[in-house]
């Protein structure tokens, strides 16, 4: 995949070349999207809109840390949707990992989560965030046990993941209407990089075959059900809907 690769660390240790080789990235000086190695982290920038800033995965600070410390935990909609109850903490495959936010919430309350991400740039961002999280004295011990990244296309990986998870979680890219600054910023950068998930409808059936208990699909409240298959079971929040489908025992 072609993208502008920039090293701002000043280390001169060839880390960017190693990164490019690992994720199959090719430097393109004229690409509007840039993957930038900074002294703190790896980040994605839209070069023609510098005011948007960089997008990176951060399990340690910012919104993620606040959500872990002060969020609803088991009371969060995503936790309810996957079926967390009492001692039951399902094994989850998050087949559309993105920046890993929902996967991290599930891991923080005790679920084991395998994240699938097919885009190599997004996978590199996730991997960088995980590496920093794993190294942290506070969250590292449990994060290493519960949150894992698999760089693969969900359309193929969903047919051969072992062991089978109890829950498959899907949050396909869908054009957002919200005007919040964060959503606008991230969606604009992400849409520029990966575009909408045009093949997302094809994920529902293999997800239902893989999950032993249920499939959870997160949708904006105005979006039609995935693959136009309606379900009476849903958890509705302000702005979103978690559609719940039966898996295959």
UniProtKB/Swiss-Prot annotation:
* Record's keyword terms, sorted: Cytoplasm, Methyltransferase, rRNA processing, S-adenosyl-L-methionine, Transferase
**Which EC class is the enzyme in?**
transferase
Specify which residues bind S-adenosyl-L-methionine according to the UniProt entry for this protein: 101-102, 117-118, 153-154, 171
Q: Assign the protein's first listed, main location to one coarse class.
A: cytoplasm
Q: Which Pfam families match?
A: SAM_MT
Which reaction does this chain catalyze? guanosine(1516) in 16S rRNA + S-adenosyl-L-methionine = N(2)-methylguanosine(1516) in 16S rRNA + S-adenosyl-L-homocysteine + H(+)
Known EC number(s)? Answer: 2.1.1.242
Q: Which Gene3D superfamilies is this protein grouped with?
A: Vaccinia Virus protein VP39, YhiQ-like domain
InterPro entries linked: 16SrRNA_methylTrfase_J, SAM-dependent_MTases_sf
Q: Which GO terms describe its cellular component?
A: cytoplasm
Q: Could you give a GO molecular-function term held by this entry? A: rRNA (guanine-N2-)-methyltransferase activity
* Keyword rRNA processing set for record: yes
Asked if the record carries the keyword Methyltransferase, the reply is yes
Compartments annotated for it: namely:
Cytoplasm
* Disulfide feature: none
Q: What does this protein do?
A: Specifically methylates the guanosine in position 1516 of 16S rRNA.
State the similarity comment: Belongs to the methyltransferase superfamily. RsmJ family.
Name of this protein = Ribosomal RNA small subunit methyltransferase J
Instruction: Tell me the organism.
Output: Salmonella arizonae (strain ATCC BAA-731 / CDC346-86 / RSK2980)
The organism's taxonomy opens as: Bacteria, Pseudomonadati, Pseudomonadota, Gammaproteobacteria, Enterobacterales
* Gene that this polypeptide is encoded by: rsmJ
């Amino acid at each position: 995949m072609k993208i502008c690769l920039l090293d701002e660390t000043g280390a001169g240790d060839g880390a960017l070349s190693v990164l490019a080789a690992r994720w199959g990235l090719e430097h393109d000086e004229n690409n509007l999207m840039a993957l930038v190695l900074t002294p703190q982290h790896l980040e994605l920038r839209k070069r023609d809109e510098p005011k948007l800033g960089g997008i990176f995965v951060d399990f340690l600070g910012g919104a993620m840390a606040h959500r872990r410390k002060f969020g609803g935990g088991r009371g969060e909609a995503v936790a309810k949707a996957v079926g967390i109850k009492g001692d039951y903490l399902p094994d989850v495959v998050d087949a559309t990992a993105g920046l890993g936010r929902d996967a991290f919430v599930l891991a923080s309350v005790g679920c084991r989560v395998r994240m699938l991400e097919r885009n190599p740039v997004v996978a590199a961002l996730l991997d960088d965030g995980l590496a920093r999280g794993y190294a942290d004295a506070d969250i590292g011990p449990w994060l290493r046990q519960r949150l894992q990244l698999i760089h693969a296309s969900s359309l193929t990986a969903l047919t051969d993941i072992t062991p089978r998870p109890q829950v498959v979680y899907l949050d396909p890219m869908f054009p957002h209407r919200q005007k919040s600054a964060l959503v606008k910023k991230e969606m604009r950068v992400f849409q520029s990089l990966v575009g909408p998930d045009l093949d997302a409808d094809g994920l529902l059936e293999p997800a239902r075959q893989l999950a032993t208990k249920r499939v959870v699909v997160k949708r904006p409240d105005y979006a039609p059900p995935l693959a136009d298959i309606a379900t009476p079971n849903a958890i509705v929040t302000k702005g979103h809907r978690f559609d719940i489908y039966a898996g295959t025992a």
